[in-house]
């Protein structure tokens, strides 16, 4: 008696084949294509998710830089106004 966990030596499932050495039937080739397409679809779904996450992260960084640029430019205008007010208040000398 053989235990249930041990595969029988005559079992044909999960047998490794080399398509370059053995001639494959039409059904075997179709099955190989079907499995490869399923694996490809699974991988592309993962990759698409990663690409979306990366795109959103890059977009967030770009928008952050863009927003900070506007913020810093608006601060420069305030500093220019403060400098102009300081020039008006300082008495003029011959060196100015």
Curated annotation (Swiss-Prot):
It holds the Pfam family Coa3_cc. It is a single-pass membrane protein. GO terms for biological process: mitochondrial cytochrome c oxidase assembly; positive regulation of mitochondrial translation. Keywords: Membrane, Mitochondrion, Mitochondrion inner membrane, Transmembrane, Transmembrane helix. The keyword Transmembrane applies. GO terms for cellular component: mitochondrial inner membrane. It comes from the Eukaryota. It is found in: Mitochondrion inner membrane. The chain crosses the membrane at residues 51-73. Residues 74-96 are mitochondrial intermembrane. Residues 1-50 are mitochondrial matrix. PANTHER family: CYTOCHROME C OXIDASE ASSEMBLY FACTOR 3 HOMOLOG, MITOCHONDRIAL (PTHR15642:SF3), CYTOCHROME C OXIDASE ASSEMBLY FACTOR 3, MITOCHONDRIAL (PTHR15642). Core component of the MITRAC (mitochondrial translation regulation assembly intermediate of cytochrome c oxidase complex) complex. Belongs to the COA3 family. Core component of the MITRAC (mitochondrial translation regulation assembly intermediate of cytochrome c oxidase complex) complex, that regulates cytochrome c oxidase assembly. MITRAC complexes regulate both translation of mitochondrial encoded components and assembly of nuclear-encoded components imported in mitochondrion. Required for efficient translation of MT-CO1 and mitochondrial respiratory chain complex IV assembly. This is Cytochrome c oxidase assembly factor 3 homolog, mitochondrial. The lineage of its organism: Eukaryota, Metazoa, Chordata, Craniata, Vertebrata.
């Amino acid at each position: 008696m053989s235990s249930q966990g041990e595969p029988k030596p005559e079992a044909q499932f999960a047998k490794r084949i080399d398509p370059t050495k053995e001639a494959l039937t039409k059904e075997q080739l179709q099955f190989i294509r079907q499995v490869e397409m399923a694996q490809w679809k699974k991988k592309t779904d993962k990759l698409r998710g990663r690409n979306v996450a990366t795109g959103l992260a890059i977009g967030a960084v770009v928008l952050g830089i863009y927003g900070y640029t506007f913020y810093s430019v608006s601060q420069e205008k305030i500093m220019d106004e403060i400098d102009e007010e300081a020039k008006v208040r300082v008495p003029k000398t011959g060196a100015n």
